[in-house]
Regions:
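Central regulatory/effector-binding core of bacterial HTH transcription factors
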Residues: 92-155, 229
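Acidic, Gly/Pro-rich loop/turn segments at junctions of secondary structure
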Residues: 118, 129-196, 252-257
Length: 310
């Protein structure tokens, strides 16, 4: 029996995800089928690749060594397929792009249109992701690349296997109801002046919620959170009704331009970055480079245009 690419892909997934159940969920198998594939691979190489650890399994030393080579082999296979598809200088490969809620509305239509114009045979699909699982989704191979949000004060996980490309950096300001805005005698405030304000922000376990709390704590206070809301449109609607203030960016406002709000600039450096996350090894793939360029152009042109529009 010889090693198959399917067996190697299963071993690589087990090395990355850690459990048979997780591998089964990502690859679309049953846990029993995953176990059978690992057993078949052990027979092929004549070595034990996994060992029991309670209810779970861990890779043996031989398993870890083979997992490293499996990743190289599978990457080489992808590169070979990419090269074959590029023989006629035309992209005709599948590509899954991860997006989060607001990018799906603001960027995805323009990205799809640009891809269709430049590469008619590129099979570009999208998958909505929560912003807190973007890096994991790319690492697991659930998507080929993903648009996400990174907060310098509470950065997303980094690793040697992923690359984070900054597409746009934008500063946070404050949004409040027009009635409350009339009581604020300034067009800019320091964070430390907001200790007595009430806020509408996402929960602490979200990247945005963690970043807001970190910025406030860095300025010496714990934010008074009246409402924990994850949806930007809902947040702005509540702000307009006077239920609290919210931290907003130009992009967030551009997606909800009808909300009757007053905005105040924050003097302190509190910002976020719209980023593209992709596997480091995938840079050699022409599709990855092409989609990266498309997303960068759309962010520069279409998103900038939406923000600049009245």
């Amino acid at each position: 029996m010889v090693m198959s690419l399917t067996h190697l892909a299963t071993l690589r997934a087990l090395d990355r995800l850690g459990t048979m159940v997780s591998v089964a969920q990502v690859l679309g198998y049953t846990p029993g089928a995953v176990s059978q594939q690992i057993a078949a691979l052990e027979t092929a190489v004549g070595e034990r690749l996994v060992a029991r650890a309670g209810r779970n399994v861990v890779l043996t030393d031989a398993g870890r060594v083979l997992a490293v080579h499996a990743d190289r082999i599978l990457t080489a296979e992808q590169d070979a397929l990419e090269a074959l598809r590029s023989v006629n200088d035309e992209l005709s490969a599948p590509f899954a792009l991860g997006v989060f809620g607001s990018t799906a509305a603001a960027l995805l239509p323009a990205v799809m249109a640009a891809a269709q114009r430049r590469y008619p045979r590129l099979e570009l699909t999208s998958r909505e992701l929560s912003v807190d699982v973007v890096v994991d989704a790319v690492r697991r191979g659930s998507v080929d690349a993903a648009i996400g949000l990174d907060y310098p004060i509470a950065p997303m996980p980094r690793g040697g296997d992923t690359e984070i490309i900054t597409l746009r950096r934008e500063s946070f300001g404050l949004a409040m109801s027009r009635d409350f805005g009339e009581t604020v005698d300034a067009d800019a405030v320091h964070l430390q002046e907001l200790a007595d304000w009430t806020f509408i922000i996402p929960p602490a376990h979200t990247p945005f919620g963690a970043a807001v709390r970190a910025a406030c704590r860095q300025s010496g206070f714990e934010p008074n959170v009246r409402h924990e809301i994850m949806d930007s449109a809902v947040t702005l609607a509540l702000v307009a009704r006077g239920l609290g203030a919210a931290f907003v960016t130009d992009t967030m406002i551009a997606l909800n331009p009808a909300a009757p709000l007053t905005r105040v600039r924050i003097v302190d450096d509190f910002s976020r970055e719209i980023v593209l996350v992709r596997p480091v090894a995938s840079v050699a793939r022409r599709t990855v480079r092409a989609v990266t360029a498309i997303v960068q152009d759309v962010v520069d042109d279409d998103l900038e245009g939406a923000i600049a529009s009245p």
